[in-house]
């Protein structure tokens, strides 16, 4: 029976999303203007943030771009923020957007090399605990020099490769032409293996994700907000590393211990081993690849290896904006591996562009947070505290809590600007400012692993094409991140309270760093 036109509109709205979800989004769209105009703009702002988090939490039911975008468009339409403020946010974050557009696509053209290296690691290390530590450590090391998003893009690219190899064989299809998103052709015997394999990949991805946070906090190029904080404090690479170390070193060590413990104890969804059948398939695949590898393929691997060296050097030395380095990777990799058709290049951009659009929506929510001054009460309360030690601990906690709901780049920027203003007005000393900058940096980077909205890398993982394949939902990510969240947050707080001041004083005495004197550059705008 054909449906009526009215029903057709309803059916088309948000497509296959469940009916209750559609009703919830429509309810949000009706409630927001009422709260904004009749009750309180501040309450409406927090309501919008909560609704946006809800759309992220339901990412597997419906990609957050559509519902989140509708909420953002309405927020701008009713005056919660302005298109100019949204544009200001986007312009201020142009580096992150360029990174997503070009760097993720650049990694796509390095796939053969990455699969080659990671297959060796995966098949070479039999112990799951050691393998998890290797993934966590490698992600941390890379994130200290590259951006966390780039590292996660690498890991996702590798995981999709592994997943599709097994899926093809289990479905009885030839390696060439196969759709790894469909499970219909898989037999019951292999279905258990597939579930275990999904759990295995999930745990490795989460270890790598947390690894990016462990490494990203240590250096000024690790995360975008680190650059902003270092810039405001006038620190260079070496000084940033040394000033952070009283907090970041204990956190890094405890993070790796946590990684080993959750695997050994098989808690919080960790501990799944690589099923033997799957290992055999990967071993066969590796052998087959080696047999059929021509000189042309070997040449491609060499070229990709050289480009990988260029990528790490260029990023570590900050030779250009991250996205532009990504563009150079695309140009070099495609030129020297012979990818010259437009349609075969287009595939590389499929993964990141929906997320880039989602991030633009995210920044419009950030614009609402700025215009409605949603974080102001928290910031004012913390700055009003007299005792310096308590102030440090509170800054860390407040940053951590806000970073869990909002983008850590935004939280870090807002806080460092407020502290800078306090310094300019003579409310705090330069010495206290330096300590607070450490508290802000570690506060935004460490506890924010709690939820995918805190870390852009986690959000990218959650909304990637891989997440539904390995059944990685928002809730599952929060549960799997929980042991790390607790350990990182508590050890970080201990570092701030007990190690930071004495260690900084001994660094001064040893002459590794010198106390800063004099004024700083004026404060940057409230954006980023």
Curated annotation (Swiss-Prot):
It is a multi-pass membrane protein. It comes from the Bacteria. One of its GO terms (cellular component) is plasma membrane. It catalyses: 2 Na(+)(in) + 3 H(+)(out) = 2 Na(+)(out) + 3 H(+)(in). The chain crosses the membrane at residues 23-43, 45-65, 90-110, 136-156, 204-224, 237-257, 305-325, 350-370, 392-412, 450-470, 479-499. Optimum pH is 8.5. Activity is null at pH 7.0. It is found in: Cell inner membrane. InterPro entries: Na+/H+_antiporter_NhaB. GO terms for molecular function: sodium:proton antiporter activity. The keyword Transcription regulation does not apply. Its main location: membrane. Keywords: Antiport, Cell inner membrane, Cell membrane, Ion transport, Membrane, Sodium, Sodium transport, Transmembrane, Transmembrane helix, Transport. Belongs to the NhaB Na(+)/H(+) (TC 2.A.34) antiporter family. Na(+)/H(+) antiporter that extrudes sodium in exchange for external protons. Can also transport lithium and potassium. This is Na(+)/H(+) antiporter NhaB.
